[in-house]
Regions:
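Membrane-interface helix/loop boundary segments of multi-pass membrane proteins
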Residues: 178-203, 230-237
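C-terminal membrane module of polytopic membrane proteins
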Residues: 246-303
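Juxtamembrane helix-loop-helix connectors linking adjacent transmembrane helices
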Residues: 22, 26-31, 47-58, 88-97, ...
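Hydrophobic core of alpha-helical transmembrane segments in multi-pass integral membrane proteins
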Residues: 69-81, 128-137, 271-291
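Functionally important transmembrane alpha-helices
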Residues: 5-13, 205, 210, 217-270
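Membrane-embedded alpha-helical segments of multi-pass membrane proteins
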Residues: 67-72, 165, 169, 219-226, ...
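Alpha-helical transmembrane segments in multi-pass membrane proteins
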Residues: 5-87, 120, 124
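Hydrophobic alpha-helical transmembrane segments
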Residues: 1-2, 122-127, 165-169, 198-203, ...
Length: 303
């Protein structure tokens, strides 16, 4: 956790410096005025103007800035993830107890090693990701919680403001990779070896949810986080939670872009139907994934 936040703080500082350079032409006339002849109030007004210009620039490109930060985190967390897997392969991990039989989610003990899973089994994750996203968003829409959460409204404006290709690149691919490397690849995996699946899944999901900064996304991501941890547990490969995360995010982006969510908000009966259908399909996918670990593969998969 410390490394994660340190990287973010350092990168935010560097990003602020870069932003000041980019806006230097606009800020120069303000900064290089006759400061000696200024009153304290006039100087404060100048600094407020500088902060406002820098702040508006950051808000305008907030998703891009978050993606740049995510790329930096991918490099750092990727190295840590690789080192963990290397130690794990060398048998240096510290299990809390005996492992569980294949196909069961253990409460304690080692997580099952990575193993080859047919591509068809990843279609179950596709169904789970789409159904969870639709059902969860419909439930949020029916309760109108999103409209009461100003922090969520601001976050939504940032997420869905840029062009759609930029949304796909940032929110659909890069940010999910950085989040999965940290929350599942490091936090979940490390706690998994010491306190078992349920504790590790809850801790990683809770930290994951609180990082989003608003009630709506916190409720959504704590549920998604538990499913992502479960996918990692059952498939034994980092590719599983990453794929599920990308599917869920892409579903949200596509439905927002096409106006599907707006249409559902105007047709509440259909929203209720989709919430029930999504829950049913998601539950079915969950049960089918439960059987994934029971099928032994001929050869192990690579992380």
């Amino acid at each position: 956790l410390a490394a994660y936040w340190i990287v973010q703080i350092v990168f935010s500082f560097l990003l602020s410096f870069v932003m000041m350079i980019i806006k230097a032409k606009e800020l120069a006339p303000i900064l290089f005025t006759e400061q000696e002849s200024m009153t304290e109030m006039e100087f404060q007004t100048v600094m407020d103007t500088v902060n406002q210009i820098a702040g508006e620039f950051y808000v305008q490109y907030q998703l891009e800035c978050a993606t740049a930060s995510a790329l930096c985190l991918i490099l750092v967390m990727g190295v840590m993830f690789w080192q963990d897997r290397k130690r794990e392969a060398a048998g240096q991990a510290e299990p809390a107890g005996q492992g569980a039989p294949i196909g069961r989610v253990a409460m304690t003990g080692r997580m099952e090693p990575a193993r080859a899973v047919p591509i068809s089994k990843y279609m179950l994750l596709l169904g789970l990701g789409v159904s969870f996203c639709l059902a969860a968003n419909c439930l949020v829409g029916m309760t109108e919680l999103a409209f009461a959460d100003e922090a969520y409204q601001e976050a939504a404006a940032v997420l869905y403001g840029p062009s759609f290709p930029m949304q796909v690149l940032c929110s659909g691919l890069i940010i999910p990779l950085s989040e999965e490397l940290f929350y599942r690849g490091l936090v979940f995996k490390r706690f998994r070896e010491r306190i078992g699946f349920l504790g590790a899944a809850f801790i990683s999901s809770f930290v994951f949810s609180t990082s989003h900064g608003n009630v709506v996304q916190a409720l959504y991501t704590i549920g998604l986080g538990m499913l992502l941890s479960y996918a990692y547990e059952k498939y034994g490969s980092f590719k599983a939670p990453l794929f599920l995360h990308v599917v869920a995010n892409m579903t949200s982006l596509i439905c927002t872009r096409t106006g599907a969510f707006d249409w559902l908000m105007k047709n509440k009966p259909w929203m209720a139907v989709l919430a029930v259908a999504g829950t049913f399909v998601g539950t079915t996918m969950y049960v089918m994934i439960q059987k994934t670990g029971e099928e032994k593969a001929d050869k192990p998969a690579k992380e």
